[in-house]
A protein has these predicted regions:
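Conserved ATP-dependent adenylate/AMP-binding module captured primarily in the ANL superfamily
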Residues: 91-126, 206-219
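AMP-dependent adenylate-forming
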Residues: 12-34, 139-146
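ANL superfamily adenylate-forming
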Residues: 114-177
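Conserved pre-ATP/AMP-binding loop-to-beta segment of ANL
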Residues: 7, 22, 143, 151-153, ...
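Structured binding elements
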Residues: 81
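Conserved S/T- and glycine-rich ATP-binding loop of Class I adenylate-forming
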Residues: 60, 77, 180, 186-189
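Conserved AMP-binding/adenylate-forming core of the ANL superfamily
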Residues: 2, 6, 24-67, 71-75, ...
Length: 219
């Protein structure tokens, strides 16, 4: 039997993986998460992000340490054609102001606080400086305070099962291989950080090259 062509978008790669592999995908502290759960949860989140008005080409910033919510958001963005802007959780006012202005982030996912930095205060104030920033999503059980620019959203509420869990995403969300998927910033050691854009095609090519180099297998 001829082998199937390699997936050319991250969403397609995830769908293929779900069909072929049923083991643990990620371990988050003491929680083992299978590929099927990653797919279902990211699809649910993708629908909720669409309901917020996010779609193809929109920038979604992620300011988180290593935790599973990062990956759920990454895959959800990939499914609706949005672009993830990865922001280091150690960045503070100066760096974040520059990157928010540069990348035109429309929604951002962050902890309420981290290492003594109050993200609720910073981000709610940032909405006045950056008109593109419409949605604040916080990884916490409590939503951010209601402010004139709009309330923050407790991220866990976007992951909760609901009546739209079987709804198909509209065709206009479907990403193409050369659509932008991810923006990361250089360290800026000799000047201001520079944005590096990564497409679906280049992200998958990089992953395959790394797997081949390290002799990584499905097990």
């Amino acid at each position: 039997m001829a082998s199937l062509p390699a997936p050319d978008t991250v969403a397609a790669a995830l769908a293929r993986t779900v069909q072929q592999h049923h083991k643990t995908a990620y371990i988050d502290h003491d929680q083992e998460i299978r590929w099927q759960e990653v797919d279902a949860t990211s699809s649910r989140l993708a629908r909720r992000l669409r309901a917020l008005g996010l779609g193809k080409g929109d920038r979604i910033g992620i300011i988180l340490p290593n935790r599973i919510e990062w990956l759920y958001t990454y895959f959800a963005a990939a499914k609706i054609g949005a672009v993830v802007v990865g922001l280091n959780v150690r960045y503070r006012d100066v760096e974040l102001d520059f990157m928010f202005a540069d990348s035109q982030i429309k929604a951002v996912l962050a902890p309420r606080s981290y290492a003594g930095f109050d993200y609720v205060q910073f981000l709610t104030q940032a909405q006045a400086r950056f008109p593109a920033l419409q949605h604040l999503l916080f990884v916490d059980d409590a939503p951010a305070p209601n402010l004139p620019d709009g309330p923050g959203i407790a991220f866990h509420t976007l992951l909760a099962p609901g009546g739209d869990d079987t709804a198909a995403l509209p065709p206009e969300c479907s990403p193409q291989p050369d659509d932008l998927l991810l923006v990361i910033y250089t360290s800026g050691t000799t000047g201001r950080p520079k944005a590096a854009g990564i497409t679906h095609r280049s992200q998958l090519a990089s992953a395959r090259a790394q797997a081949a180099h390290t002799k990584l297998t499905a097990d």
